[in-house]
UniProtKB/Swiss-Prot annotation:
Assembly description: Interacts with host IFIH1/MDA5 and DHX58/LGP2. Forms with host DDB1, CUL4A, STAT1, STAT2 and STAT3 the mumps virus V-dependent complex (VDC).
Organism of origin: Mumps virus genotype B (strain Miyahara vaccine)
Chief location: virion
GO cellular component entries: host cell cytoplasm
Protein name per UniProt: Non-structural protein V
Primary gene name: P/V/I
Length: 224
């Protein structure tokens, strides 16, 4: 079988291709009409038959985000996730985490090792990673041989921090923040009857048994 195309066959192929191109260029474009068998001249370009369609993707505009409509709408609908957790209550801890009067919390800075100085475009990411590891290790006790190792969880504490404690109590919580090239840790106390949320929040007592202050948060309010 001859694999080379003759000169007269080349001319026929070029002419056929031009005819196909002119056919589609001259045809009007109507909305979302796509390529189908009915729009192709039989015997002209059989290879085009069966090609996948190119669907028109409609993106929602900002004016439609968050609105509710009856029926089925066209286009993709965005998934809107609220930045705050609904139903958890409490007061959100401000960002960046600075100590503020009357809120009952302290801010400490996790200083970096001067011998470790990452460079390049990922410098901030590397410094934040180092600071996070040091902050976590700061509040995690070393494994004991007599007791099983438990996973670190924000809000974990001593026996008085158990939610089932009838006398009430406080639990210590921590939040990590990256502020102006430094890793800062904000510490505060919440009543044990309040939920442990992913977002850093101040909560008030709901059961009536939790004290206003405990031995953990007395230093948060400064000298009396």
């Amino acid at each position: 079988m001859d694999q080379f195309i003759k000169q007269d066959e080349t001319g026929d192929l070029i002419e056929t291709g031009m005819n196909v191109a002119n056919h589609f260029l001259s045809a009007p474009i109507q909305g979302t009409n796509s390529l189908s068998k009915a729009t192709i001249i039989p015997g002209v370009a059989p290879v085009l038959i069966g090609n996948p369609e190119q669907k028109n993707i409609q993106y929602p505009t900002t004016s439609h985000q968050g609105s509710k409509s009856k029926g089925r709408g066209s286009g993709a609908r965005p998934i809107i996730v609220s930045s705050s957790e609904g139903g958890t209550g409490g007061t959100q801890v401000p960002e960046p985490l600075f100590a503020q009067t009357g809120q009952g919390g302290i801010v400490t800075t996790v200083y970096q090792d001067p011998t470790i100085q990452p460079t390049g475009s990922y410098r901030s990411v590397e410094l934040a990673k180092i600071g996070k590891e040091r902050m976590i290790n700061r509040f995690v006790e070393k494994p004991r041989t007599s007791t099983p190792v438990t996973e670190f969880k924000r809000g974990a504490g001593s026996g008085c921090s158990r939610p089932d404690n009838p006398r009430g109590g406080h639990r210590r919580e921590w939040s990590l923040s990256w502020v102006q090239g430094e890793v800062r840790v904000f510490e505060w106390c919440n009543p044990i009857c309040s939920p442990i949320t992913a977002a850093a929040r101040f909560h008030s007592c709901k059961c009536g048994n939790c004290p206003a202050k405990c031995d953990q948060c007395e230093r948060d309010y400064g000298p009396p």
